[in-house]
Curated annotation (Swiss-Prot):
GO terms for biological process: mitotic cell cycle; positive regulation of transcription by RNA polymerase II. The keyword Phosphoprotein does not apply. It holds the Pfam family Myb_DNA-bind_6. Its main location: nucleus. This is Myb-related protein A. The gene is MYBL1.
Length: 757
């Protein structure tokens, strides 16, 4: 019977030295009592013993288990049976915590790291880091070159996955083991994967797919993107235009050397990689030197095909990451391409180079991304056509361009056919077609930030054409010193359409926006040539443009400054939410007066001009207010109320009568009825009130002589008077109840009760 493979839980029982906090205990142990797998009965018994005795005395617990040491019991409980252990999937917070702890303590102190993660042990943290969180671990799909290395190494080493992992940097032993057991072993044993017979067929299949990809991509570009750019969209390889045949043989031999060196399981792999790097760099320099010399000899005779080359000096490290495409155009004068372009092309076989480059980990991931979705990588619209200029409006798609080149290179006429608003506006002249050189810059696969792409405003009286004149002509002069005759687009297509009409002719003095003129004439322009431009208000689409609006003018509401927001947030975070404190009554009184003045339009309160005089008068009145003990308002208060409600021109008799009547209104009806017989006492009270009114009148006259102004009450508030005079419904009910109570009281006792103020 075949031996059953051990699970990860069983491996955990045997590999004690995986945890650094257990090494000292293992050294003290001379003999492990029983290394047999724990049974279910032993696990249940250990759980009960731990529940009864705790986790402090493992020697006592081990005495109840046969052939188990205290260390074995502790290890089994802490690593397997503890219910607090978390064996589920890792959360994002746990992953982030592991990354921070590894940066702090290093990737070896897993027991210390596990103490900061509740429910996780050191082995879990170690496996999580090495298999998933380590940034050096490759998570891309497996390549055929990696499969071949695993296949050859497994034939020699067997299941020694740690040794095999050393041959594949970026792959862990666990991932290699899982890949072999899940996929590779079945394909090798049943389908004959990586055998000699299937190798040639796989190469033929790869070459056929590489040959088919450009056609699919061309249809996609022509139909979907409205760009007609016949660019080879297969995986970029070294293709240089060189007149020497020896370079082709030299590069082919180097590719064969690379392929042979990586097929064999050679321990000197790194040394051969360095030799390959030097070989490729020397080949590249030689090709460039010969190409520059040929360009200096025959400058007008440029290549009639599209050449892709790598312009980065360090070719080995940047081939898969940075790829620049340079397009060159032919002089279309009715002659064939072979007559004008004597150059030959270095076209290394695609499979030879790809199979060698895929064995290098730096290139495998990038090549897989390109192979997985060729349509997306060949989609020119997904890349930014200009790095330094951002178009304010959406650029119109370009369709086709024809170039008519003169024999003397005196004029270069450019006419374009564009797609505007779904309609084709054609202005094509000439007989031969050439491609509009919209060169995508593929060295950066992301659009730069908007701050870096903002367009500088043009100075007054200067057009975009004038700025481009010097640069384009200088490029035509210095083209012999560069390795490419065409530069990337320095403009926005909308800028081209806004300044150029459909039938406009261009020459060397007034060049186009799109490319370097195809001519060898050297012209020095010292004075910028101003072009006659149409004023903005006379343009056809001037009324349909969206006006530029500053963002600061859009929001009319006041906004809290950012520093104040930050300070307020910090205060709330530190001291809690802010609370409103009670204001003094003086401030509240002022606020109420302002609100009432805004609503009513008049100030119903006293307007003070001399505060000292008003305070002196107020102090004299306050002494009499302190003796108020009952609900009945005394005559002094009524006199003061009458002084506020009426003008100071009224006579003494009117005020005294008013004070007397208002005082009677506030007295309960029962008390008035009972005291009718006591007229002498009432007369005495009236006399005393008259005397008091006379005294108050003198004081009011003194205050009025010191410019204290009293405002008239324009309209009496009847609701307020009803409340004050006790005429509301509830007040009348209370008054009636009080009258009945006093009637019953006076019926029992004949003696009258005097009101003491």
């Amino acid at each position: 019977m075949a031996k059953r493979p051990r699970t990860s839980e069983e491996d955990d029982d045997f590999q004690y030295a995986d945890h650094d906090y257990e090494i000292s205990q293992q050294r003290s142990l001379k003999k492990i009592c029983n290394r047999v797998k724990w049974t279910r009965d032993e696990d249940e018994k250990l759980k009960k013993l731990v529940e009864q005795n705790g986790t402090d005395d493992w020697a006592f617990i081990a005495s109840h288990l046969q052939n188990r040491s205290d260390f074995q019991c502790q290890h089994r409980w802490q690593k397997v049976l503890n219910p607090e252990l978390i064996k589920g999937p890792w959360t994002k917070e746990e992953d982030q915590r592991v990354i921070e702890l590894v940066q702090k303590y290093g990737p070896k102190r897993w027991s210390l790291i596990a103490k900061h993660l509740k429910g996780r042990i050191g082995k879990q943290c170690r496996e999580r880091w090495h298999n998933h969180l380590n940034p050096e671990v490759k998570k891309s799909s497996w390549t055929e070159a990696e499969d071949r290395v695993i296949y050859e190494a497994h034939k020699r080493l067997g299941n020694r996955w740690a040794e095999i992992a050393k041959l594949l940097p970026g792959r862990t032993d666990n991932s290699i083991k899982n890949h072999w057991n899940s996929t590779m072993r079945r394909k090798v044993e049943q389908e004959g994967y990586l055998q000699d017979g299937t190798k040639s067929s796989s190469e033929r299949t790869g070459s056929s797919t590489l040959a088919q990809k450009p056609c699919v991509t061309m249809e996609h570009l022509h139909t979907q993107n409205q760009f007609y750019i016949p660019v080879q969209t297969h995986i970029p390889v070294y293709q240089y235009a060189s007149p020497e045949d020896s370079c082709i043989e030299h590069a082919s031999a180097s590719a064969n050397l690379v392929q042979q060196s990586f097929i064999d399981d050679d321990p000197d792999k790194e040394k051969k990689i360095k030799e390959l790097e030097l070989l490729l760099m020397s080949t590249e320099n030689e090709i460039r030197r010969k190409r520059l010399s040929s360009q200096a000899g025959s400058l007008p005779g440029w290549s009639g095909s599209f050449v892709m080359e790598d312009c980065v000096p360090n070719t080995l490290n940047s081939l898969g990451e940075q790829t620049s495409e340079f397009y060159s155009m032919d002089e279309t004068q009715g002659t064939s391409v072979q007559q004008n372009s004597p150059t030959k092309y270095l076209a290394v076989e695609a499979n030879a180079v790809l199979s060698s480059l895929q064995t290098i980990p730096e290139f495998a991931e990038t090549l897989e991304l390109i192979e997985s979705d060729p349509l997306a990588w060949s989609d020119v619209t997904s890349f930014d056509l200009s790095e330094a200029v951002a178009s304010p409006v959406k650029p119109a798609p370009l369709k086709l361009m024809r170039i008519q080149h003169n024999e003397r290179a005196a004029e270069c006429q450019f006419n374009v056919s564009v797609m505007l608003d779904g309609k084709k506006h054609s202005s094509i002249s000439g007989e031969e077609e050439a491609v509009f050189p919209t060169t995508p810059n593929l060295t950066k696969y992301s659009t730069p930030p908007a701050i870096l792409r903002k367009k500088k405003r043009l100075r007054a009286g200067q057009s975009p054409v004038n700025e481009l004149n010097d640069g384009l002509c200088n490029d035509a002069i210095n083209v012999a010193l560069k390795h490419t005759p065409v530069k990337t687009l320095p403009f926005s297509p909308s800028q081209f359409f806004n300044t150029c009409s459909g039938n406009e002719q261009f020459n060397l003095e007034n060049p186009a926006f799109t490319s370097t003129p195809i001519c060898g004439q050297k012209v020095l322009i010292t004075t910028p040539l101003h072009k006659e431009t149409t004023p903005t208000d006379q343009k056809e689409n001037a009324g349909f443009r969206t006006p530029t609006i500053r963002r600061s003018l859009l929001g009319s509401t006041p906004r809290t400054p950012t520093p104040f927001k930050n300070a307020l947030a910090a205060q709330e975070k530190k001291y809690g939410p802010l609370k409103l404190t009670s204001q003094p009554l003086a401030f509240l009184e002022e606020d109420i007066r302002e609100v009432l003045k805004e609503e009513t339009g008049t100030d119903i309160f006293l307007k003070e001009e001399d505060d000292s005089v008003y305070k002196s008068c107020k102090q004299e009145h306050n002494s009499s207010k302190k003796v108020r003990k009952s609900l009945v308002l005394d005559a002094w208060e009524k006199e003061e109320l009458g002084a506020q409600l009426f003008t100071e021109d009224s006579g003494l008799d009117v005020q005294s009568e008013n004070a007397y009547t208002t005082s009677l209104l506030m007295i309960p009806l029962l008390e008035i009825h009972d005291n009718r017989c006591n007229l002498p006492s009432e007369n005495q009270d009236t006399n005393s009130s008259n005397k008091a009114n006379a005294v108050i009148k003198k004081k009011l006259n003194a205050c009025s002589s010191k410019n204290i102004k009293l405002e008239k009450s324009l309209q009496p508030n009847y609701e307020w008077e009803a409340v004050v005079y006790g005429k509301t419904e509830d007040q009348l009910i209370m008054t009636e109840q009080a009258r009945r109570y006093l009637n019953a009281y006076t019926a029992t006792s004949n003696t009258s009760r005097a009101l003491i103020l």
